[in-house]
Swiss-Prot record:
GO terms for molecular function: pyridoxal phosphate binding. Keywords: Pyridoxal phosphate. It comes from the Bacteria. Pyridoxal 5'-phosphate (PLP)-binding protein, which is involved in PLP homeostasis. May have a carrier function to deliver PLP to the target enzymes or a protective function so that PLP does not inactivate essential lysines in proteins. Does not have amino acid racemase activity. GO terms for cellular component: cytoplasm; cytosol. The keyword Transmembrane helix does not apply. NCBIfam families: YggS family pyridoxal phosphate-dependent enzyme. Belongs to the pyridoxal phosphate-binding protein YggS/PROSC family. InterPro entries: Ala_racemase_N (IPR001608), PLP-binding_barrel (IPR029066), PyrdxlP_homeostasis (IPR011078). This is Pyridoxal phosphate homeostasis protein. The modification N6-(pyridoxal phosphate)lysine is found at K36. It comes from Escherichia coli (strain K12).
């Protein structure tokens, strides 16, 4: 077993243990392998170990990887864009990715809707919440959620699937859980209006257990799978 396969197995075991501790089924939680700055060869190792969902933060880098595996004839992969999205890059996301986690304004959602090719299924989207109210983070306030969700839900080439957040780092589990619960409550409220939504993208390596206990359905794990990132190669 190579390092990436070993790391994936360890992460899956942690997800399973965290789910079991709070009475949830591990199958309720999707592992999104964050492969930003990592070479296609590392992703190939993860694919060989059974991983199919990958997250990318940089548009062109992600598109290059998507094309690489398409040219190799690899099927069944699911590509998630999880970085801040500029208007001038929206077409590439609309044309190549399966998911976009970072919807935080109607203008971007409308562009993605208009640019999604007719031959592809609707683009799965999550609305990003700035749950810790950090100036450095993208996302909307919870008070803005209802209005944006209603507008996004009307766009036919997008499929609203739920919410995403990147909470501020917290060292204490209790505080991690409190913040994650705020997101879970917002997600539950949204689900009463849009019963089809099913995805709360919340939790990374340091707060995964608290996020799962609060109700996360998708955790985003990078370094614990692929090792430290080299941002000089992005």
């Amino acid at each position: 077993m190579n390092d990436i396969a070993h790391n994936l197995a360890q992460v899956r075991d942690k997800i399973s243990a965290a789910a079991t501790r709070c009475g949830r089924s591990p199958e309720e939680i999707t592992l999104l392998a964050v492969s930003k700055t990592k070479p296609a060869s590392a992703i190939a190792e993860a694919i060989d170990a059974g991983q199919r969902q990958f997250g990318e933060n940089y548009v062109q880098e992600g598109v290059d990887k998507i094309r690489h595996f398409q040219e190799l004839g690899v099927t069944g992969l699911e590509w998630h864009f999880i970085g801040p999205l500029q208007s001038n890059k929206s077409r590439l996301v609309a044309e190549h990715f399966d998911w976009c986690h970072t919807i935080d304004r109607l203008r971007i959602a409308t562009r993605l809707n208009d640019q999604r090719p007719a031959e592809l299924p609707p683009l799965n989207v999550l609305i990003q919440i700035n749950i810790s109210d950090e100036n450095s983070k993208s996302g909307i306030q919870l008070a803005e959620l209802d209005e944006l969700a209603a507008a996004v839900a009307e766009l036919p080439r997008l499929r609203l699937r739920g919410l995403m957040a990147i909470p501020a780092p917290e060292s204490e589990y209790v505080r991690q859980f409190e913040v994650a619960r705020q997101m879970a409550v917002a997600f539950a409220g949204l689900k009463t209006r849009y019963p089809h939504i099913d995805t709360l993208s919340l939790g990374m390596s340091d707060d995964m257990e608290a996020a799962i206990a609060a109700g996360s359905t998708m955790v985003r794990i990078g370094t614990a799978i692929f090792g430290a990132r080299d941002y000089s190669k992005k």
